[in-house]
Amino acid sequence: MQTLIIGDVHGCARELSDLLNKAHFSPSRDRLLLTGDAFSRGPDPLGVWHLINAHGAEMVLGNHDARLREQLDDISDTGSPSRTKPDQRFTLHALESIHSTLRTWLYRVPLYIEEDRFLLVHAGINPEHGLANTRFEEFITIRTWPPVKGSIDGPRWHDVYEPVHPLLIFGHDAPGGLVTKRRDGKPYLLGLDTGCVYGRALTGYLLEEERLISTASR
């Protein structure tokens, strides 16, 4: 069995399929986890949903997933979402056939997955207060430290993070790119959002092999 953890997919179903093939992933044998932000912004959110189901993927909640969930709540309550941007309208339209199913599923997606070997979150944790005292918004949006709302520049939260988990894996920070931090030769922190939806690459990590793999955006 291998455990494959993949960065933000953002509706890039072809690249997700490419990466699964590159890893020789078998749903009957292996385990797939995603850093969140699976559907929004990209060309084929429904294709991503089918791959998630076909491969039994687990996921942590991202900021785009939280927003999508709110919009699906609006549709359920009033018949239409509020405050949507063009890319969000595209995503909602592409997922129209599974709105109810997806909404239920998103409410079951956790903010983090913590196990003996790793902690998986979308954006990060509060480096001063730790996992137990990280707020909802920090789990899904934290980037800089100290936090500056909307900013993509400046020191990152993980620049001041002292490792207390064997391996902390996150996504969210496409501007920051691939992040690999080691101590005593072993990785203790990995940032896997390498901006596939922006024309760069989709990146995954094979946990047992301690090996990064990636596929170019197409």
Q: What do these predicted regions represent?
A:
Residues 1-50, 55:
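N-terminal active-site segment of His-dependent metallophosphoesterases
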Residues 2-10, 118-124, 190-192:
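Active-site-proximal beta-strand elements of phosphoester/diester hydrolases
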Residues 5, 34, 59-60, 119, ...:
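Residue-level marker for buried hydrophobic side chains located in beta-strands
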Residues 8, 37, 52, 62-63, ...:
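Divalent metal-coordination and catalytic microenvironments
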Residues 10-14, 40-43, 66-70, 127-128, ...:
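Active-site environment of divalent metal-dependent phosphoester hydrolases
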Residues 27-29, 56, 116, 164-165:
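A general structural motif
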Residues 45-120, 126-127, 131-156:
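Active-site neighborhood of divalent metal-dependent phosphoester bond hydrolases
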Residues 139-218:
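Acidic, His/Gly-rich catalytic cores of divalent-metal-dependent hydrolytic chemistry
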